[in-house]
Amino acid sequence: MSEKVKFEKRESLKEKPDTANLGFGQYFTDYMLSVDYDADQGWHDMKIVPYAPFEISPAAQGLHYGQAVFEGLKAYKHNGEVVLFRPDQNFKRINNSLARLEMPEVDEEALLEGLKQLIDVERDWVPEGEGQSLYIRPFVFATEGVLGVRSSHQYKLLIILSPSGAYYGGDTLKSTKIYVEDEYVRAVRGGVGFAKVAGNYAASLLAQTNANKLGYDQVLWLDGVEQKYVEEVGSMNIFFVENGKVVTPALNGSILPGITRKSIIQLAEDLGYEVEERRVSIEELFNAYDKGELTEVFGSGTAAVISPVGTLRYEDREIVINNNEPGKITQKLYDTYTGIQSGKLEDKYGWRVEVPKY
């Protein structure tokens, strides 16, 4: 990829939405970043272009054989400064996903530079309200128009931007209801569970819909072999507080290595909490609850940062955790994490990356 980013200016700019009613993924900025790949040139022709529909061959391999990966990260505005949060980790992870699907890896530094230039162009789209952000969606898909199960020789990478509202609509964390899925599985070891590939999310929709019909917000996935060990919840990693310890399932190849998860573990340790990464069975959790040892449960991910779990149902039993209220450790981790993101707290880790004015 070239570090020089071309800029194709659009004739007129969009009217920006009311920041009081942004929601998530509903609005998109004026421009997007585009990069092409072919077997002869590699990644090339990085440019900032108007956000608009584009043509693709009906035979594009990504539509038929699933070569498609994506990422999700955010930019924040504080006192006029626009910053990214750990973007290097997202581009490392997208390369891991690309490698797993036999897709060409990207130049992480060049892509980050292109993203910074895109966000600088769209600086006025970054909302500054409490909990608001500019959601960033990089994605790569196969474009070669030929049928046949093999790796494509052509790909396109796009980065689109979407101003997003506060996940909870304010500062107060809201607990979720979780259904433990014991029929379908999300991933198996040796598969693509550790990668952020489009098919993982498509495969989760049926179980998610079934859980919603029963009155639950998300699904807690169990392992794909014995269906007894906890893996992750919905589109988030999962944490438990047992006997004052912060416990999370160890990465095993079928769990997405969340960047929020990684950050939460480091923050928890630095705040003095004991953290355990290990196998956690669903039976252990319900036994711990019966003994009064399971006091908090929460998920972690880019969208919500931290999402407290207030209700957990497995088979015919439902338990209520901490009276459906966020626990003290959950709240402390959320406040610390979002404080660093927003610039209200010191960033001693170097996680915030400023977007310069070009």
Curated annotation (Swiss-Prot):
**What EC number(s) has UniProt assigned to this enzyme?**
2.6.1.42
This protein's cofactor list reads: pyridoxal 5'-phosphate
Q: Which UniProt keywords apply?
A: Amino-acid biosynthesis, Aminotransferase, Branched-chain amino acid biosynthesis, Pyridoxal phosphate, Transferase
List the Gene Ontology MF annotations in alphabetical order: L-isoleucine-2-oxoglutarate transaminase activity; L-leucine-2-oxoglutarate transaminase activity; L-valine-2-oxoglutarate transaminase activity
Q: Which pathway does this chain act in?
A: Amino-acid biosynthesis; L-isoleucine biosynthesis; L-isoleucine from 2-oxobutanoate: step 4/4; Amino-acid biosynthesis; L-leucine biosynthesis; L-leucine from 3-methyl-2-oxobutanoate: step 4/4; Amino-acid biosynthesis; L-valine biosynthesis; L-valine from pyruvate: step 4/4
PROSITE patterns from the entry?
A: AA_TRANSFER_CLASS_4
Q: Name one GO biological process term.
A: L-valine biosynthetic process
Q: Which reaction does it catalyse?
A: L-leucine + 2-oxoglutarate = 4-methyl-2-oxopentanoate + L-glutamate; L-isoleucine + 2-oxoglutarate = (S)-3-methyl-2-oxopentanoate + L-glutamate; L-valine + 2-oxoglutarate = 3-methyl-2-oxobutanoate + L-glutamate
* A family per Pfam: Aminotran_4
Source organism: Staphylococcus epidermidis (strain ATCC 12228 / FDA PCI 1200)
Kindly provide the name given to this protein in its UniProt entry.
Probable branched-chain-amino-acid aminotransferase
Function noted in UniProt: Acts on leucine, isoleucine and valine.
The modified positions for N6-(pyridoxal phosphate)lysine read: K196
- Family per record: Belongs to the class-IV pyridoxal-phosphate-dependent aminotransferase family.
Matching entries from InterPro entries are given as: Aminotrans_IV, Aminotrans_IV_CS, Aminotransferase-like, B_amino_transII, BCAT-like_C, BCAT-like_N, BCAT_family
